[in-house]
Swiss-Prot record:
Protein role: Catalyzes the dephosphorylation of undecaprenyl diphosphate (UPP). Confers resistance to bacitracin.
Membrane spanning residue stretches: 4-24, 41-61, 83-103, 108-128, 184-204, 218-238, 246-266
InterPro entries given in the database record: UppP (IPR003824)
One BP term from GO: cell wall organization
Organism lineage string: Bacteria, Pseudomonadati, Pseudomonadota, Betaproteobacteria, Rhodocyclales
Protein name as it appears in the record: Undecaprenyl-diphosphatase
């Protein structure tokens, strides 16, 4: 699809912001839509890193008051120290496994067909989980134990497969391990900060040779679009899950994934293959 680069940047920025914290896989959407728009060259890798960083900052802004309290009290207040400890423990599995398998997964699995398959499988899993008996024992992040954070951390590590969804894995993992919907969603948001920040720094370092001053205007458009779209999505998502299940997201994943697989099978779209 032949669109001006600034339009592609705007589209992908909005897509990233809207999908990063929903259980539908932002990385999967960026891979599929980027492939559809023909924006999948080396520069696009850096662009996607930049717009994901914008989404991190949006969460930091939305939760700035709580994060400021934690930062102010981390040296002396047990509650703040415990909160940071929970995030550190939850971050560890993805950090360790990411360093071990990050490059292999990116080279082998970052393609539309893998994403589509993961979207469908993840959607079916969400439907199955939503039909289980649900009795939360943890109604706030502050009530979590170290073991709860570690288990959610391992769930997050599974989301290294594109199309799985980091937020989906952590939120649904939280539900399985006894967190309320709101507590699971908020811990997922907080856990995204160290996880995505570390991934951003690591990816930028590895792709530093692809950074060029001439790309800054396009990157800026995507950054701003992602930031404001993510701010909206986080607030809307918290309101939504207060009164709804994740079934709508499950069906969205299944339908979207099947459409991509069908267009590939029928040769309607020439998707990039493994």
């Amino acid at each position: 699809m032949d669109l001006p680069l600034f339009v592609i940047a705007l589209i992908l920025g909005i897509v990233e912001g809207l999908t990063e914290f929903l259980p539908i896989s932002s990385t999967g959407h960026l891979i599929i839509i980027g492939d559809l728009l023909g924006y999948n060259d080396a520069t696009s890798k850096v662009f996607k890193i930049v717009i994901q960083f914008a989404a991190i900052l949006a969460v930091c802004w939305d939760y700035r008051e709580r994060l400021a309290r934690v930062a102010a009290g981390v040296g002396s207040e047990p509650a703040a120290q415990r909160f940071v400890g929970l995030l550190f423990i939850g971050f560890l599995p993805a950090a360790v496994l990411g360093l071990m398998f990050h490059s292999t997964i990116k080279s082998l699995l970052f393609n539309p067909l893998t994403v589509a398959t993961a979207l469908v499988v993840g959607g079916v899993l969400i439907l199955w989980l939503e039909r289980r008996a649900y009795h939360p024992r943890i109604n706030a992040v502050d009530e979590m134990r170290w073991a709860d954070a570690l288990k959610v951390g391992f769930a997050q590590a599974a989301a290294m497969i594109p199309g799985t969804s980091r937020s989906g894995a952590t939120i649904l993992g939280g539900l399985v391990f006894g967190l309320s919907r709101k507590a699971a969603a908020e811990f997922s948001f907080f856990l995204s900060i160290p996880t995505m920040f570390a991934a951003t720094v690591y990816d930028l370092y590895k792709n530093r040779d692809l950074l060029h001053m001439g790309d800054l205007p396009v990157f800026a458009i995507g950054f701003v679009a992602s930031f404001f779209a993510a701010m909206f999505a986080v607030k809307a998502f918290i309101r939504f899950i207060s009164n709804h299940t994740f079934i709508a997201f499950a069906w969205y994943r299944i339908v979207f994934g099947l459409v991509v697989l069908a267009t590939w099978q029928l040769e309607l779209v020439e998707w990039s293959e493994p």
